[in-house]
Curated annotation (Swiss-Prot):
Protein name: Holliday junction branch migration complex subunit RuvB
UniProt keyword Hydrolase, yes or no: yes
Catalysed conversion reaction: ATP + H2O = ADP + phosphate + H(+)
Places the protein is found: Cytoplasm
Length: 347
């Protein structure tokens, strides 16, 4: 399951290069996430009216839904600079201090994967976010003293796929917290048509809708599928993405009508065939698939849970009736009786 997946929500190098040209610049261009966008629009207008920076903002949700894009839009709407970094990239307190001291008034510091900040870094970030001050230790031993350096007022925008891993003190310092949801097919259709115009791709509404329907509710995936179908249309067809062209291309990519690929189906089959439908522990499931536990939780599970193909229980993962039906496997009715035998077959 380690080969590159066309439906993975995580960004590859090609995605990062292309996404820069496809990202919206303003809130008016941002498609989907209507509730979040409206709340942020009000926050921006209020902050501008008071002449203050935005409240510290936390964006969370599955990967590929536009957290980084939204941070860039907020910076553009506020007319300020944005500095991009990530939790793993800030290894020492000095790294964070260098970032903070280079910020100008009202600037935005965007920290992706903020849940991966280590605790020592968080201790430096707390007073910076709360008091706009940086505490620096000068000297060593008994003569060491703390020096407080004032910082210009700024905004931290944090992004995470794992809200539960944030410590309470860090989470409490964000005045604005927003969850990004999976996109509707209609919203993804609009994204396909917009991206096709930017990339100079001739795409029919029917072809765009077919791509949108298989994109797992994720803009990053819909843009990647658009590029793959474009390549197919250019080589096999006449360069136009029609309904038939889109279906043929996506079939060759092994992306079915719900957006599942061979890796998703293999995961579901493992639960059904190797573990009798579950429950199976996460680490056991990951080992059987030669996958990382984090990849199962962050990449595979969110969409399968959204479809209702998977259940998380205290005893492990269970494949639902819908998963059996999608794979064309006869469903085995089961009961779970406090550790007693499971998997009873009912006639």
């Amino acid at each position: 399951m380690s080969r590159e997946r066309v439906v993975t929500p995580k960004a590859g190098e090609e995605d990062q290069q292309i996404e820069k040209s496809l990202r919206p610049r303003r809130l008016a261009e941002f498609i989907g996430q209507e509730k979040v966008v409206e709340q942020l629009r009000i926050a921006i207008m209020a902050a501008k009216g008071r002449g203050e920076p935005l409240d510290h903002t936390l964006l969370y949700g599955p990967p590929g839904l536009g957290k980084t894009s939204l941070a860039g839009v907020l910076a553009a709407e506020m007319g300020v600079n944005i500095k991009l970094t990530s939790g793993p990239a800030i290894e020492r307190a000095g790294d964070l201090a260098a970032l903070l001291t280079n910020l100008q008034k009202d600037d935005i510091l965007f920290i992706d994967e903020i849940h991966r900040l280590n605790r020592a870094i968080e201790e430096v970030l707390y007073p910076a976010m709360e008091d706009f001050a940086l505490d620096i230790m000068v000297g060593k031993g008994p003569g060491a003293r703390s020096l407080r350096l004032k910082l210009p007022r700024f905004t931290v925008i944090g992004a995470t796929t794992r809200l539960a891993l944030l410590t309470s003190p860090l989470r409490d310092r964000f005045g604005s917290v927003h969850r990004l949801e999976f996109y509707s097919v209609d919203a993804l259709y609009q994204i396909v048509m917009r991206s096709a115009r930017i990339l100079g791709v001739d795409c029919t509404p029917e072809g765009a809708h077919e791509i949108a329907a298989r994109a797992r509710g994720t803009p990053r995936i819909v843009n990647r599928l658009l590029r793959r179908v474009r390549d197919y249309a250019q080589v096999v067809g006449n360069g136009v993405i029609t309904l038939e062209t889109a279906r043929d291309a996506l079939a060759k990519l092994e992306v079915d009508h719900l957006g599942l690929d061979d890796n998703d189906r293999r995961l579901l089959r493992a639960i059904i065939e190797l573990f009798n439908g579950g429950p199976v522990g996460l680490s056991t499931l990951a080992a059987s698939l030669a996958e990382e536990v984090d990849a199962i939780e962050d990449v595979y599970e969110p969409f399968l849970l959204q479809l209702g193909f998977l259940q998380r229980t205290p005893r492990g993962r269970i494949a639902t009736r819908r998963a059996y039906e999608h794979l064309g496997v006869p469903y085995v009715e089961r009961t779970i009786d406090n550790g007693a035998d499971q998997g009873r077959l009912w006639s």
